[in-house]
Amino acid sequence: MGSSSFLVLMVSLVLVTLVAVEGVKEGIEKAGVCPADNVRCFKSDPPQCHTDQDCLGERKCCYLHCGFKCVIPVKELEEGGNKDEDVSRPYPEPGWEAKCPGSSSTRCPQK
């Protein structure tokens, strides 16, 4: 095998490797989930991104407010809700209890 054949083989291997690595990069999804979008759109905005890799830093490519944009993701919810914020709890914070009007006690007298 001559040196020119060896050079062609090496260049081909490098190109195939670069293309394969680039394909893998595009499939990588950044951590977190896209924030909820409750906006009703009459017209979509042009996309600012197509994949998470189009966005800088921790930002993800999400459909938000009528178009794809790079936004800061929210934490993923664990099964049963997020430990930091349980929206299913009827009270504003753990340990909160209703107080009787004009009393510091949590027990109200029965009528």
Swiss-Prot record:
Biased-composition ranges for Polar residues? 102-111
Q: Which cysteines are joined by disulfide bonds?
A: 34-62, 41-66, 49-61, 55-70
Q: Which residues belong to the signal peptide in this entry?
A: 1-23
Q: Please list the residue ranges annotated as the WAP domain.
A: 27-74
Cell location? Secreted
Please tell me in which tissues this protein is expressed. Answer: Highly expressed in prostate, skin, lung and esophagus. Weakly expressed in skeletal muscle, epididymis, kidney, trachea, salivary gland, testis and seminal vesicle.
GO BP terms = antibacterial humoral response; defense response to bacterium; innate immune response
A cellular component annotation (GO) from this entry:
extracellular space
Main location class: secreted
Which keywords belong to this entry? Antibiotic, Antimicrobial, Disulfide bond, Protease inhibitor, Secreted, Serine protease inhibitor, Signal
Instruction: Name the InterPro entries on file.
Output: Elafin-like_sf, WAP_dom
A GO molecular function assigned to this protein is: serine-type endopeptidase inhibitor activity
* PROSITE patterns per the UniProt record, alphabetical: WAP (PS51390)
User: Which residue ranges are recorded for the region named Disordered?
Assistant: 80-111
Give the PANTHER family listed for this entry: WAP FOUR-DISULFIDE CORE DOMAIN PROTEIN 8 (PTHR47769:SF1)
Query: What is this protein's function?
Result: Antibacterial protein. Putative acid-stable proteinase inhibitor.
This one is known as WAP four-disulfide core domain protein 12
Q: Which organism is it from?
A: Homo sapiens (Human)
